[in-house]
Curated annotation (Swiss-Prot):
Ranges where the record places region Disordered: 1318-1408, 1457-1491
Protein source organism: Danio rerio (Zebrafish)
Principal location listed in the UniProt entry: membrane
Name of the coding gene: nrxn1a
Protein name: Neurexin-1a
Cited SMART domains: 4.1m, EGF, LamG
Amino acid sequence: MSFSMRNGAHLIWIGLLVCCLVDMGASMEFTGAEGQWARFPMWNACCESEMSFNMKTKSAHGLLVYFDDEGFCDFLELLIHNGRLSLRFSIFCAEPATVFSDTAVNDSRWHAVTLRRNFKNTTLVVDEEIKWVEVKSKRRDMTVFSHLFLGGIPPELRSVALRLTSSAIKDEVPYKGWITNLRVNGSEPVLIGSDGVNSDICEADHICLNGGVCSIVNDEPICDCSETGFQGKDCSEEEAYVGGLAHLMMGDQGKRKEREEYMATFKGSEYFCYDLSPNPIQSSSDEITLSFKTLQRNGLMLHTGKSADYVNLALKNGAVSLVINLGSGAFEALVEPVNGKFNDNAWHDVKVTRNLRQHSGIGHAMVNKLHCSVTISVDGILTTTGYTQEDYTMLGSDDFFYVGGSPSTADLPGSPVSNNFMGCLKEVVYKNNDVRLELSRLAKLGDPKMKVSGVVAFKCENVATLDPVTFETPESFITLDKWSAKKAGSISFDFRTTEPNGLLLFSHGKPKPQQQKDPKSPKTLKVDFFAIEMLDGHLYLLLDMGSGTTKTRAVNKKVNDGEWYHVDFQRDGRSGTISVNSIRTPYNAPGESEILDLDDKLYLGGLPEDRAGLIFPTEVWTALLNYGYVGCVRDLFMDGQSKDIRRIAEAQRAVGVKPSCSKEPPKQCLSNPCLNSGTCREGWNRYVCDCSGTGYLGRSCERDATILSYDGSKFMKIQLPVVMHTEAEDVSLRFRSQRAYGVLMATTSQNSADTLRLELDGGRVRLTVNLDCIRINCTTSKGPETIFSGQNLNDNEWHTVRVVRRGKSLKLMVDDLQPSEGQITGDHTQLEFHNVETGIVTEKRYMPAVPSNFIGHLQGLSFNGMSYIDLCKNGDIDYCELNAMIGYRSIVADPVTFKSRSSYVTLPTLQAYYSMHLFFQFKTTSPDGLILYNRGDGNDFIVVELVKGYLHYVSDLGNGAHLIKGNSNTPLNDNHWHNVMISRDTNNLHTVKIDTKITTQTTMGAKNLDLKGDLYVGGVAKDMYKDLPKLVHSKEGFQGCLASVDLNGRLPDLQSDALSTAGQVERGCEGPSTTCQEDSCSNQGVCLQQWEGFSCDCSMTSYGGPLCNDPGTTYIFGRDGGLIVYTWPPNDRPSTRADRLAVGFSTQQKDAVLVRVDSSSGLGDYLQLQIERGNIKVVFNVGTDDINIEETSKFVNDGKYHIVRFTRSGGNATLQVDDLPVIERYPSGNIDNERLAIARQRIPYRLGRVVDDWLLDKGRQLTIFNSQTTIKIGGWEKGSRPFQGQLSGLYYNGLKVLNMAAEGDPNVRVEGSARLVGDMPSSSITPQSSVSAAGNRSETSPSITDITTTTASNRQGKQTTTPQDDLLVASAECPSDDEDIDPCDPSSGGLAHPPLPEAKGYPSPEVIRESSSTTGMVVGIVAAAALCILILLYAMYKYRNRDEGSYHVDESRNYISNSATQPNGAAVKEKPIGVPKNKKDKKNKDKEYYV
């Protein structure tokens, strides 16, 4: 059968041009004339509805669709704007929403257009492009009143005002082109009326006869008769058949009115096979024609030939593929449509022609050479032409003609696809000069040479599409049947994702025990396996047939960009190819095995949670890293057979597998879904939270991660059920520690030295990876690879560590620091391990050096996706051993108690030559004591000690001793645990950290600390203290507890590891058996906590005894008056900035002097405690004016026992009687300070510093009680008011004068009527302690400020706080610089007031501020003016004759109070010194303020 060449080609061209109009329904031609319109019934597009049509135009502008609510708010318009569709609509007068298509529609091609309304949303679909837009309206529904208009608006609507809701629509030009197949909600609307619109000419009856297809070309109807068996203008003429071979002339060749179409439906497993062996083909020119209709993207349509002589016609990714090889190389052609794909479920016609042509060649000889030109056209429009190579021009085939598929499509030579066709094929015809094979017809008629495989329906039926599925989570997967591809096979599929990692396909075979050369080595399991995985966006093929693994990167570009990719894997024996979007990559498997034995099921998208029985080869990294695939998969074919994975997923009820595929915009992280500072990244339609640095777990980092506390003896050990072999690991954890050393995590093996270990090493994180090459008979290993990152990580803060290994590549990340990277140098990349251990390495058999145990906290350990700490703690795994403490616990490791100051232990020499990291914890109540000492060569040594409650670190590297004082707010002997870290780096940067406070200093010179001999801990032998370096203050050892001792990464046991032990050193730390309580001491006595009990400081109570409840030493002063005088030795007269006085008494006198303290003759400083008009009053003068403080709210001359407490600091004072509120006195500012400030402005600049220093010294002197000489008790002196009554328990600045009088102290004399009552009380320690009784001076509390104190009251509900004003000596103040070498060392005579605990719920002391100007004072000043002048002259005379030696302060007597200085040595800021404005008798002395 052949066409008339005059009409045939023309009709085919035209017929194919309009083939898509078949079954499109009525069509309309819009001429584009002025006033053109077409009116249809109202489309109620309020809620959910759809409208669709096909269009063809070449105009760049025009109105397509319009309707509205007739002038109110709502409208919708669809225009052509610049060749693209523009959709614009509004609801409820909202701002109109607009969307533009990307597809150009003015290309004179047919385009399918759909409008979908869904309340506020409207979707525009142009061919395969989908765009949607939402209007920001307060109402959901669209109101429609008008008709549906196409192509234009009637003139009457344009002329009437307010009839059109969209004012701009009347200016739009009419549409010019074709519209067909109009549907509204699935049905064809009725045309109400039109103007300027032509109906389809082809609708008239009998335009084309015998089933010819009518179309309009140049406004004329044209008939396509190609499928009718007729020809002519109206398909009425009979087609002439040319006779051929008898065996091909089948069926009726005569006339017929209607020609039957031969078609068949293929569903993926069916195919036709025509046997050519009886009559092989041998041709130089031939033609193949067929029509197809499908929704599938890939599939074989026709194939004939084998080896290097074949023709292959297939659908490949929606395009038509032709491959021809005549023996000298393949000619390949790929025809793709301009828009969309050919798998659009519409009929498409394919024609392939091959003709022999003669071409002139230029060369040695002018020879005409023959070439074969090949032309392929689809739908008569898309044509590709090429030439086969010159040497071979004949197609010869004695094989088979395959139609719709084959038994093994992947094995066909030149086949670009591996799966069979799914859809409809009709009129498949091959013909050459000699033969015409109507293959579709032969199959239906059952020709004996034609074999039909499968159940084929010889009509076109709908073929179920292979719907895509989406794997929504890494845990989702589908199980497929076992893939039997022992010798050869193929798998193809499409996928799309934006995620970088995931296991797409995996299957393995039966385990094969491997024989090891070393009989001691365990047997390992070897399996055949097949996998396709994604890592870092790249696609990999992995294959092992038993003789070695091949790993092939399918394509060099990354394939996680969200686009569809077609993957086709084909294998034949040891070789094969994997292609991605036609980019083919070959591979060759190593070894000799050609059989792939896969015994297990094939897993798609991931692996099951229960993996018992599964064996993961080390080469499949995604399986071991637990990277499941997240994304879409479609069109899966195995050996050419389709797999409906949607139905399979539904049948398996696969969790997390959705039967569709849509790509959402990457906006998942915009709402900040990751809580607790988790890091968010966009995944495939999901967000992915990185919680590794947060301390939380869960999809959104919403769940607290378990914290484990390690004290050096605790661990967590994961004992895996089977030995693991990996080539890739992901490890992350958080830790917090104060030690510079300790193992964080390690993998260990029972059979080798393999390990991946994370540990702290000198404050840095160290990663060690050791792959034991020796046992596995590979290239000898060069030793473990080591990488460091971070510094000073032992700061007791949380730090995050991440490790990523991929084969030989290592990456270590700490917090947000720059990653440290490394490479494994050996050939071996496999890590073997049985255990994952934390805290302690218990599998030590093959370790040359065991890392130090960990002390600190771990959280969030994740190893290859497994959160082992929480899995173990929650009981989700039963192969873990855990004894670490759960939760955040305060860690005290291996505590040891030094029971006495003479106890100590010795350890081997401290190794600190280049650098040093020491850590320990201590708890004590002792203010002083030697903690560590190690001597060295020459002058080298190191000492750590407590001095008055503060830590001192002393060292000498050969350049002289250097002292660093630790920084702490309060003394450290408070019976609480304190953490101490001392380090020295290679640059001589010394660091001392106490709890959270850090002190650093760099020393110059020598950098090496060369120690030798034993390391003493807790003290040294008694006879060694005198030989300690000068900067070492300790004279006794440390009494208290030490714990968590870390000596440069070594954790010694202070008992079992000790070389020697002296005194009582016991394990554990119980602390004091008796502790201070609120009521431990009576009468406001201060409780002093000591290691073996407590004692009471009764100084300011007037009482005595162990608990301050015994009467103090009491004297009765008779009616004739008595006097007790204490006189300081001439060289021991103190000068004080602060004073403390307490005494108890009973009397009935209204006026009397109780106590008076005087300075040396001529100075005039004094302090006097007296009763005036029945009230207690104190008057003192320290170089300014007399300052008074008085308690007027209570009379004390009632014969009852009263206690008076007085303190002074400079010019400030406090007074308390009994339990009354404390009265505070703050004098007003000194007027002379203002005068001096004015004078300072006139002092030359060069003398400014000198004057300032002098003024500062004068200011200090104005607050000092100078050169105290006597303490007089009883007031029996000439002109005074003697006291009559009882005085008890007198205390003044550490002196208990009444006790001293009773004991006959030579510095005390008793005169007149003063008689001792009762026995002298004593102040001793509680029964649990062993402190001796007090002597003449207060010896019970020489360092009260270094001890935790509790003040007790003998009355409920009344608690008074003793003022913090302290004793100071002007010429011997405590240094305030931390770098000072000699600390302040007050003598036993200076008693400091101890710090008190916070008073809660008690009233604040009453503060009384006296006025500096009263009427009485003014009158007194006026009356005494003349007397003041005489006194002033006398004072000046005394000054000129005064010896400077009278201002000498004996520095050997130090009355400085520790509590008067800040913990770092700075003096407490004093309150301003005030002097009344109207001064009384001024003392014009040089120590005052005259310049």
